[in-house]
Amino acid sequence: MTSIGQLRSQVASKERSAVEVARQYLERAERLDTEVHAFLRLTPERALAAAEAVDAKIARGEDPGLLAGVPVAVKDNLCMVGIPTTCASKILENYRPPYESTVTRRLEEQGALIIGKTNLDEFAMGSSTENSAFGPTRNPWDLGRVPGGSSGGSAAAVAACEAVASLGSDTGGSIRQPASFCGVVGLKPTYGLVSRYGLIAFASSLDQIGPFTRTVEDAALVLQAIAGHDPLDSTSLAVNVPDYRQALISDLKGVKVGFVKEFFAEGLDPDVADAVFEAIEVMRDLGAQIQEVSCPRFARGLSTYYIIATSEASANLARYDGVKYGLRDREADALVPMYGRTREEGFGSEVKRRIMLGTYALSAGYYDAYYLKAQKVRTLIKQDYLDAFAKVDVLVGPTAPTTAFAFGDKVSDPLSMYLSDIYTIPLNLAGVAGASIPCGFDAKGLPIGFQIMANALEEGKLLRAAYAYEQATEWHKRTPALAAEALTR
């Protein structure tokens, strides 16, 4: 699979035109997606127009951008002017945004070719992409298994080589967990480093946009393109974005690495544990100083998250009432029944479940007992991570307790599904950075993810650790059979 750097070089040197690249990937995505269903729609007109603009810049001798000629897919909760943006929900099935998300604008300013919008769990609520109103995405490594979620389509598109990179959103693990399940790199940046303007909100204090790629270097390049302050997002951090490529060093001499002991307790699959411990030993061989670190309030993370996230979701999703945009029930004879029937028809069962949980947590008489208490525990969880990062440069552990599970295995057991994110959720509560990189395969031949975590705005440390590990191993070079076959055509 061609990397971002290689592809940009080929396009910039006129070895290949950006238009040629766009057509190649659009054709491949159309062919492979009959099996994978990573995309909800392809955007050929937009991609080809962007490709023509890149080729024109090169012909004029201008800098075509950091991502010139690179086919990128974006999760379908990121707004693009005039292109249906559904959040994989019937309530937004025909919604065409009148404005552009900051991240898609920045991608195209750097020469990226946005080839399509990817599938997700409805409103990014789920861990398997089974909650999409438009059908599930399949894991390219085993079409009978889930790709993870909620950004399952974005992860599967990169794993299947339908796109060189993609964007997802991560509220409690929705980039890192599918990256683990699909055997790709997934990066959740520090909260506020990447603008959320144009991201349709799930839980506003937790949501963050980040890239999926096949290599750590490619993730650094995409992050470079999309990071930075945005006056359109009041939560965007006013910080200078460093050159993340300078962090890509292939040794870990002097780097302090802490493994979180609470991540290795009951519930962790033995194959996953073995692969992660082997990855830690590789880091030791690269010169890292390894030590055990404790995050004592780890066990409170899941319940804290599901109070805060659902509370914010119930408020954010109150706007979908059939009045201004989206689905509207046409049979109701009064306003209040129209509200109810619109939401009943438009929302799926998991979204309704989370709205009800959040509404309950915010209701009079329960606000202090649930929501306010959860916010206090969130502060304590954040302090756990601050204390840990005072001792080490990065933390490591498994991304998910298991590898990809079969379709239907957890649908009837929401708690079991929620536990898929038990190792990723605390980072969103703390607002720090995390990434999942491939570190092996289980006995069934399914990918295993290795989670590397760094303090807020220390993506450079995270990328250095991830890059050094990646360069010492071969896991990122493995490709699913269906993608390998497509690449030979």
Swiss-Prot record:
A Pfam family it matches: Amidase
A GO biological process held by the record: translation
GO MF entries: ATP binding; glutaminyl-tRNA synthase (glutamine-hydrolyzing) activity
Enzyme class: ligase
Catalytic activity: L-glutamyl-tRNA(Gln) + L-glutamine + ATP + H2O = L-glutaminyl-tRNA(Gln) + L-glutamate + ADP + phosphate + H(+)
InterPro entries found in the cross-reference section: Amidase, Amidase_CS, Amidase_dom, AS_sf, GatA
Catalytic residues (positions): 75 (charge relay system), 150 (charge relay system), 174 (acyl-ester intermediate)
The entry's keywords: ATP-binding, Ligase, Nucleotide-binding, Protein biosynthesis
Family according to the record: Belongs to the amidase family. GatA subfamily.
PANTHER family: GLUTAMYL-TRNA(GLN) AMIDOTRANSFERASE SUBUNIT A, TRANSAMIDASE
Oligomer status and interactors: Heterotrimer of A, B and C subunits.
Protein name per Swiss-Prot or TrEMBL: Glutamyl-tRNA(Gln) amidotransferase subunit A
